[in-house]
Design a protein with these regions (language model features):
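Short, ordered, surface-exposed loop/turn motifs in non-cytosolic proteins
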Residues: 30, 37-52, 60, 71, ...
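A short, amphipathic beta-strand motif
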Residues: 30-36, 231, 637-639
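A short, solvent-exposed loop/turn motif at the edges and junctions
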Residues: 50, 146-150, 166-204
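Short, acidic Ser/Thr/Gly-rich low-complexity loop/linker segments typical of extracellular
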Residues: 54-71, 120-122
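Extracellular beta-sheet/turn segments enriched in Thr/Pro/Gly and aliphatic residues
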Residues: 160-169, 198-219
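Middle-to-C-terminal accessory/interaction subdomains
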Residues: 237, 260, 278, 288, ...
Length: 643
């Protein structure tokens, strides 16, 4: 009998569950299409990856991608049973009948982003389970059985006219066995213009469409454009900003973006514990040092109006690029980190005017803060964000000092996860280090971060451990701490001007040991002037990562050298930026002296271009000739500088 109203038409599907476990290595291929959620247009250039592994694809001009990889799954050879589940759709509701599947104990329905839609324990004698109404889309249904066995299949309540339909396919069984837990990496979708997206464990769905939500901040970081930033500051406030530069106090300024008036914001000079003291004395008198002629700015859009935002941002940095005579180090470095899948600030060149007077070329750099977290972890934006707090002790105050999450009072912040991270590292042995630490850190991601950091010869980042009478510590990085269950702690790079040297200033020129070389002693070594640094390998997290995961690191580096760090790719990027900023640099009022003018800039750009093939070649030689030492030695837990 045919139903009169198709809306109530029942669609039935029987799924046979064969719990069959076997050892196999097979190839999996995902194909899909990525589109803009608002316009529906295809999105080109989306980075699609299997977690943070080397399996990466990029969408074409039609938004299509194909990602293939070999999947090695260890399984115990055993046939458990064969059962059947009746799956029925009435309207938008799914009804499951487990009458012929007595081993089923619990069901869970999940969206492709990993969120739980529905979960229920199957009560003996009550085999019928009615799930809530489902909207259009693909869902993963997981059924738990005895002996840690689990079946998965996908359901898709596609609406055809008014008639819901279901498409389901079985996946292989998974079981926790000796030697590890069988798991799948999520598919990650990243593009500078959009919020990131992930699909958790799409076991039985190999072809699908994805919609990415545009990120409003991306407009500011369009690398094809050079926008104008004009600040009107009173004479008194200008003098105050100079006088109080070391106090880092904001002063009011009227901000105009291109031809649009934004309103009153806060502005101040920006600099680390080195650059501002270099340029100002305690009275606010500026130094005559050439690097102090043009100083970076920090902008605070909500300083005088708590609700004011600038393209969803509260803060923004304008880097003067004074110490980088090529003007390319920051933008090349941040771009390379992002191309390698690392969560990194976006950046774009801009023109700056103070009271309508041209100040030259600057680089707008995204601020790692709560708004940054919201743009990178849209489903988990409220975690702690720490600046320069390495897991080296169990002091709550130590981690609270580094909190950069603006909305959360530091005194009430829960920093227990970072303390647990430190304890896992401190207590780990060579045999259980990866297992213990991977509960807090994604090692594929960490190795990719190190690969970029070492390739660009970053001599002022997390791999350089400065030493003083207060202890030792690294800097120019952030950690973001996810709040979700089993959430990880992620590194974010910062301050990239001391990069892209032809040789590593600390390792190649001053003789400090590389990160993977175990030193005979962890005594500090002299680097430049009176500055000292601890051998990087002496940090237990870094040292044991080098000792235990070197082969994985080499594979990541080999892929990077052939793609994003290849000579053609980097040279193309450099030439694009050179052409983009040429006329701006030519007019920069601070590039006028004989040793720091337009012609010297051209010379520095050419030097950087000539350095790229040398850096590529030497890095290739390094990873294939410098395997870590096998000599046994004690690791030193470094004591971080706290003030």
């Amino acid at each position: 009998m045919t139903a009169k109203f198709s809306f109530f038409k029942k669609v039935m599907y029987a799924v046979t569950i064969c719990l069959c476990i076997s050892t196999s290595i097979f190839s999996t291929t995902y194909t899909g299409n990525v589109r803009d959620s608002k316009s529906g247009n295809p999105v080109k250039g989306v980075r699609v990856s299997l977690g943070y592994t080397n399996y990466v694809a990029t969408t074409d001009e039609n938004g299509n991608f194909t990602l293939s990889f070999e999947d090695s799954i260890r399984k115990e050879q055993k046939t458990f049973l064969s059962e059947k589940v009746d799956l029925q759709f009435t309207g938008g509701n799914a009804v499951l009948n487990f009458n012929a599947a007595p081993s089923a104990k619990k069901i869970g329905l999940f969206a492709l982003n990993g969120k739980t839609v529905y979960s229920q324990t199957i009560v003996p004698g009550e085999p019928v389970v009615k799930m809530p109404s489902l909207s259009k889309g693909i869902y993963i249904l997981k059924i738990d059985h005895p002996q840690n066995l689990q079946t998965e299949f996908s359901i898709n309540p596609v609406v055809n006219g008014n008639s819901p339909m279901v498409v389901a396919s079985m996946s292989s069984m998974q079981q926790q066995i000796a030697g590890g837990v069988l798991s799948k990496e999520p598919l990650l979708f990243k593009h500078d213009t959009y919020y990131p997206h992930s699909i958790a464990m799409p076991v039985s769905v190999h072809s699908f469409a994805i919609s990415l939500n545009p990120d409003p901040r991306a407009y500011i970081f369009n690398e094809q454009k050079i926008y104008s930033y004009n600040f009107t500051i009173s004479k008194d406030d200008s003098l105050k900003m100079e006088r109080d530069a070391l106090l880092e106090n904001f002063v009011p300024a009227q901000f105009k973006f291109n031809d649009s008036s934004i309103g009153q914001i806060g502005i101040r000079y920006k600099g680390s514990g080195y650059s501002l003291p270099l340029c100002f004395d305690s009275r606010g008198v500026r130094s005559s040092d050439w690097r102090c002629k043009k100083i970076s700015f920090k902008l605070k859009f909500d300083k005088y109006s708590g609700s004011q935002r600038f393209f969803s941002m509260k803060r923004l940095n304008l880097h003067s690029l004074s110490g980088d005579q090529s003007k390319m180090h920051d933008i090349l470095s941040y771009g390379l980190f992002r191309e390698m899948g690392i969560i990194s600030p976006r950046a774009a060149f801009v023109k700056v005017f103070i009271n309508s007077v041209f100040q030259g070329l600057f680089l707008a750099v995204e601020e790692p803060d709560s708004r940054f977290a919201e743009s990178r972890w849209p489903d988990d934006p409220y975690g702690n964000l720490y600046k320069e707090k390495w897991p080296v002790n169990d002091s709550k105050e130590y981690y609270k000092e580094g909190l950069a999450t603006n909305e959360k009072p530091k005194d009430n912040a829960d920093v227990s996860k970072m303390i647990s991270f430190y304890k896992a590292i401190n207590r780990a042995t060579e045999s259980d280090f990866v297992e213990k630490v991977s509960k807090f850190m994604n090692f594929d991601y960490f190795l990719r971060y190190i690969a970029v950091d070492r390739a660009i010869h970053n001599c002022d980042g997390m791999m350089t451990w400065y030493y003083s009478n207060k202890g030792s510590g690294n800097h120019n990085y952030f950690f973001y701490e996810e709040t979700i269950a089993n959430g990880k702690i992620w590194q974010i790079p910062w301050d990239m001007d001391n990069t892209f040297y032809r040789q590593d200033p600390i390792v190649d020129e001053l003789g400090a040991p590389e990160w993977n070389v175990r030193p005979r002693t962890c005594e500090p070594v002299k680097i430049w002037g009176d500055n000292l640094a601890m051998p990087t390998h002496c940090d237990k997290l870094i040292g044991m990562t080098a000792d235990l995961l070197w082969d994985e690191y080499v594979k990541i580096c080999e892929q990077m050298l052939a793609t994003h760090f290849s000579v053609p790719h980097l040279t193309s990027r450099l030439d694009f930026y050179k052409d983009l900023i040429d006329t701006i640099v030519r007019k920069d009022p601070y590039l006028k002296d004989p040793y720091n003018d337009y012609n010297s800039w051209l010379g520095n750009v050419n030097y950087l271009r000539e350095s790229i093939p040398i850096m590529n070649s030497t890095y290739d030689s390094y990873i294939h000739k410098k395997a870590p030492s096998n000599k046994k030695n004690q690791f030193c837990l470094l004591i971080a500088i706290t003030s």
